[in-house]
């Protein structure tokens, strides 16, 4: 008889304990929701790196282009990479946390200016500008890959290097656009 009472009490205490611990566990999970945000930012970073790699591949091919029409792929890759990076900047907390990439606007304008007159052969100085842009962008891409730490934070030293290289490339393209 006393074993039966002890068993009922144990079951009752087990149910009460379960009813107390289960909501506490749910509350803990809800409050530590930050992990998913980190995961989303890290996934967005991976997409952005992929878009930057696509742009790098098209910039590698750009100096071999014969005509302005061949630069359409560069223009598309620029748009995609720029769009993705802008979203990453917003997700990372704004331009105070992650630098924007102004060279993309200047490169896009440079390509559009070349294509303005329709399809034509590229001039030697335009090909040289594409080669120099490719070389400078390769350095930027190497930095960009290391921009986010494994915990989802922006690495400030890499961000500073990226900002410097972006400024140099933007100034170079601005100068070429004025010639």
State what each model feature region is:
Residues 121-179:
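C-terminal amphipathic alpha-helix
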Residues 29-75:
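Immediate post-signal-peptide N-terminus of mature secreted/exported proteins
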């Amino acid at each position: 008889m006393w074993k039966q009472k002890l068993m009922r009490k144990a079951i009752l205490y087990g149910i009460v304990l379960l009813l107390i611990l289960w909501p506490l566990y749910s509350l803990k999970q809800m409050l530590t929701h930050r992990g998913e945000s980190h995961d989303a930012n890290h996934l967005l970073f991976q997409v952005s790196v992929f878009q930057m790699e696509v742009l790098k591949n098209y910039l590698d091919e750009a100096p071999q282009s014969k005509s302005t029409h061949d630069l359409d792929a560069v223009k598309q890759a620029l748009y995609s990479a720029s769009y993705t990076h802008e979203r990453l900047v917003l997700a990372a907390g704004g331009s105070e946390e992650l630098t924007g990439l102004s060279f993309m606007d200047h490169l896009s304008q440079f390509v559009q200016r070349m294509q303005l007159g329709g399809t034509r052969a590229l001039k030697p100085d335009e090909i040289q500008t594409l080669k120099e842009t490719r070389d400078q962008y390769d350095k930027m891409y190497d930095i960009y890959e290391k921009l986010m730490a494994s915990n989802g934070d922006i690495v400030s030293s890499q961000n500073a290097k990226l900002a410097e290289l972006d400024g140099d490339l933007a100034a170079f393209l601005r100068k070429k656009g004025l010639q």
